[in-house]
């Protein structure tokens, strides 16, 4: 198990003009993965058009209870704390 902090940006983190708008901490997560390719496309199709990642990459955090939190990876940074 590990603790992580997720910083959320107002746009694509690869753009120097993006700024942090939120910060969330998760304690005792089971794991995480960054999903790209076909699986990321499937995730994008399950969300509304405004929630899709421009770079087709998603961060999935598996919580202690088995639930998951999914983020547009190009809009967040995750740090182990």
Named regions from a protein language model:
Residues 1-2, 80-81:
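Short intrinsically disordered terminal tails
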Residues 2-13:
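A short beta-strand micro-motif
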Residues 8-10, 63, 80:
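Residue-level signal for short segments within beta-strands and strand-turn junctions
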Residues 16-78:
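Acidic, low-complexity, intrinsically disordered interaction modules
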């Amino acid at each position: 198990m590990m603790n992580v902090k997720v910083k959320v940006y107002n746009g694509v983190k690869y753009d120097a003009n993006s700024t942090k708008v939120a910060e969330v901490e998760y304690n005792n997560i089971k794991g995480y993965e960054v999903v790209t390719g076909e699986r990321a496309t499937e995730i994008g199709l399950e969300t509304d058009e405004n929630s899709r990642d421009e770079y087709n990459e998603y961060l999935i955090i598996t919580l202690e209870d088995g639930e998951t939190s999914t983020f547009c990876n190009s809009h967040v940074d995750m740090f182990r704390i």
